[in-house]
Regions:
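N-terminal entry segment of metal-dependent catalytic domains or homologous docking segments
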Residues: 1-55, 120, 153-164, 260-267
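PP2C/PPM family metal-dependent serine/threonine protein phosphatase catalytic domain
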Residues: 2-15, 79-92, 126-168, 239-253, ...
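Short hydrophobic beta-strand that contains or immediately precedes a catalytic carboxylate
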Residues: 28-30, 115-117, 174-176
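Acidic loop->beta-strand submotif enriched in PP2C/PPM serine/threonine phosphatases
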Residues: 13-22, 94-109, 113, 138-186
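Catalytic phosphate/metal-binding cores of nucleic-acid and nucleotide-processing enzymes, i.e., regions
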Residues: 1, 26, 105, 232-233
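Short helix/loop capping segments that flank catalytic or ligand/cofactor-binding pockets
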Residues: 37-38, 124-125, 183-185
């Protein structure tokens, strides 16, 4: 399989504020936050398209990278906002642009470095062990406001996460925006509740949070004893070959109250060459 990505716009909307890249040894997803600021879709595209080819390994290097790219974006958007003036310009000056970021780089010696800022998520699934690892914290934390990269304001070190996955020929590395990430982690928890109590606890916390994702988590109990790879991952991965089929599948999940309404983006890293 080659590296590839696809993105589905929120049902009923025109603008997709997600962005992604998928290269041989790097994938990334960014979710532009349209609830605050302006130019969110451009900022998310700008972030993924300006990622370095070599991995970011710690907060200081992440901060240095953002510090080295934000000004060009800011100046270009400022000039455009000035043409409109008024509320748009004031909003840009006051709030700027916001986005999350999740990225992964393939390393030598069967390693993969990942970083995240916000609630976009990098995953590593081992097809032989049937195990899923990811860059996020707990399922119920999707209910919290995410950390966001702003085009003009300082970063918060607490928002940055990084780590390394051990990978093999059986590993699949992929990244998604938050609504899809919640669905994936939620259903993995449900299919593994009898294997380890930690999955039952994680899913139960989301149910009892009485937040926007709790109804989805309740529905996830229908996945108990199901084959996670078959009923969840394969359907998502096959959608990378046929966007229309993926859109129909995601709309069905949304109608069944298993998936939040959002832009949906997935990027997958190709097999080792």
């Amino acid at each position: 399989m080659n590296s590839k990505y696809t993105s589905i716009t929120k049902f009923g909307e025109i603008t997709n504020e997600d962005a992604a890249i998928a290269k041989d040894n790097i994938i990334a997803v960014s979710d532009g936050a349209g609830g605050g600021g302006v130019f969110a879709d451009r900022w998310s595209r700008y972030l993924v398209n300006n990622l370095p080819e070599y991995p970011i390994t710690n907060y200081d290097s992440f901060d240095k990278w953002v510090d080295g790219i934000w000004e060009q974006f800011y100046n270009a958007c400022e000039e455009e906002a000035k043409k409109t003036g008024g509320l748009l310009l004031n909003k840009f000056y006051d709030e700027g642009s916001f986005a999350t970021l999740a990225a992964a780089w393939r390393l030598p010696e069967n390693k993969c470095r990942w970083i995240s800022y916000g609630d976009s998520v990098v995953f590593c699934y081992n097809r032989n062990a049937k195990e899923l690892h990811h860059s996020f914290t707990r399922l119920c934390d999707f209910n919290n406001p995410p950390y966001l990269i702003n085009c003009k304001d300082p970063l918060e070190e607490n928002g940055f996460r990084t780590g390394v996955f051990d990978i093999s020929d059986d590993s699949v590395i992929f990244a998604t925006s938050d609504a899809l990430a919640h669905y994936i982690i939620m259903t993995y928890d449900a299919t593994n509740v009898y294997r380890d109590t930690q999955f039952e606890v994680d899913l139960g916390e989301d149910v009892h949070a009485k937040a926007r994702n709790s109804n989805y988590a309740i529905g996830a109990f229908g996945f108990i004893n199901k084959d996670f790879e078959k009923v969840v991952l394969r359907k998502l991965f096959s959608g990378l070959k046929n966007k229309s089929n993926l859109e129909r599948h995601l709309k069905s999940l949304w109608e069944k109250q298993l998936l939040g309404l959002d832009d949906y983006t997935i990027a997958i890293m190709g097999d080792q060459k």
